[in-house]
Amino acid sequence: MEVLYSLSKTLKDARDKIVEGTLYSNVSDLIQQFNQMIVTMNGNDFQTGGIGNSPVRNWNFDFGLLGTTLLNLDANYVENARTTIEYFVDFIDNVCMDEMTRESQRSGIAPQSEALRKQSGIKFKRINFDNSSDYIENWNLQNRRQRTGFVFHKPNILPYSASFTLNRSQPAHDNLMGTMWINAGSEIQVAGFDYSCAFNAPANIQQFEHVVPLRRALTTATITLLPDAERFSFPRVINSADGTTTWYFNPVILRPSNVEVEFLLNGQIINTYQARFGTIIARNFDTIRLSFQLVRPPNMTPAVANLFPQAPPFIFHATVGLTLRIESAVCESVLADASETLLANVTSVRQEYAIPVGPVFPPGMNWTELITNYSPSREDNLQRVFTVASIRSMLIK
C-alpha cells in the first residue's frame, strides 16, 4: 500500500510540476525520484481486472529515464515525460479500481489484487516512501492491530432508523401520546407528542426519552443541539404499528422543557448537559440519551386554548422536539464521512463493473446495512478500500 501511495504522490507531483518552461534546477529532486520509480518498475509485468465486468489488462514497464538539462524544460522533454506519466497514472487507476472491487472475510486489511500484492515485494522498497497520508498511517496501524485514530468532520455513524412508539393509544387512534424519531448519518431528530397536550398527565407534564446507541465510540465531539425537530413539524399520515390502518398527525410545536442530554460510555455517564442549546462538547461516548418534557401551558390566550381543548376531538397535537447533530468527532473505526467522497468512489466503481455480491459487503454497499452489522471483517475491508480510494483521488478526480 505504501508503494502505491508513493507512486501516486510522485506522479501527482510530476504531472503538476514537470511543465514547459520550468527551470530544471527547481524540479531536479523530483526528476531523480521519478527516475528511481522508473528503474524500479521497469522489467515488471502486472495484470488487473477480471472481476465482474472489469476487463483484464496487462501492464509492461520498459521506459527510458528522464535526462538532465542546464536550462528550462522544453516541449520535447515535457512530452517525453508526459507519455510515461500518463501510462503510470492509467496503471495506478486500474490497480486502485481492481483493489476496490475485491473483498475477503479473512485478512481483509491486506492487499487483495494480484497487482498490489506484487508491489509488496522487496524490490519495490527502493521506491521513495511518502507516508504523509492519514489513511496510509492508519492503514499501517490497523494492519499491525495497533490503536488507530480517524478524524471525521461528519461521521456517518448512525444507521437510518425512522419509527415511533406509542405510550398511549386506542383502536380509533384519536388520542395518542408517544415519540417519533429519525436517525441517519450524523443527525438525530426526535419528537414527543400528546394529542391532549398533557391534560391528564401528572402536573400536566409528559416526559419523553430517546436513547441512541452508536456502532462505535466517538471522542472529542463537537455537537449542535437545537430545541426543535423540523422533520416532525408538519402534518402527515402514519401507518399504524400493525399495518392495519393509518393515523393522522397534525403537530403544533411547543418548546421542550427540562431538556437533558447524557453521553455515556459503557453505561457510565461521561457528560451531561441540561437546558443548554447550540454547540456542546462530548468527551467520549458510545450512547446518547435525550430526555425532555412537554408541559401544558398554564396560561393560554383563547386562540391557544382552542388548539388544546380539555376533551376530544383533538384536532391539533401538541409536539416538542430536539435535533442533535454530530458536527465533528474522532473515531478509532473506519466510517464514511459526509465531507469525503471515498464511499461514493468505491460504490460507483463496484456498480460500474457490476461486481457480484461477495462475502463481506452488502449489495450496493448499502451503508445502513453495513454499519448496522459492522463486523471486524467489514472494518478491515473498509480500511483497505478507503485507503485505496484516497490514493486514487490524488490522480483521478
Curated annotation (Swiss-Prot):
The keyword Repressor does not apply. Zn(2+) binds at H153. Ca(2+) binds at N266, D286. Keywords: Calcium, Capsid protein, Intermediate capsid protein, Metal-binding, Ubl conjugation, Virion, Zinc. GO terms for molecular function: host cell surface receptor binding; metal ion binding; structural molecule activity. GO terms for biological process: fusion of virus membrane with host plasma membrane. The N-terminus is blocked. It comes from the Viruses. GO terms for cellular component: viral envelope; viral intermediate capsid. Residues 62-73 are annotated as: Interaction with the inner capsid protein VP2. The VP6 trimer contains a zinc ion located at the center of the molecule. The zinc ion is not essential for either trimerization or transcription activity of the DLP. Zinc-depleted VP6 has an increased sensitivity to proteases. Belongs to the rotavirus VP6 family. Homotrimer. Interacts with the inner capsid protein VP2. Interacts with the outer capsid glycoprotein VP7. Interacts with the outer capsid protein VP5*. This is Intermediate capsid protein VP6. It comes from Rotavirus A (isolate RVA/Pig/Australia/CRW-8/1987/G3P9[7]). The lineage of its organism: Viruses, Riboviria, Orthornavirae, Duplornaviricota, Resentoviricetes.
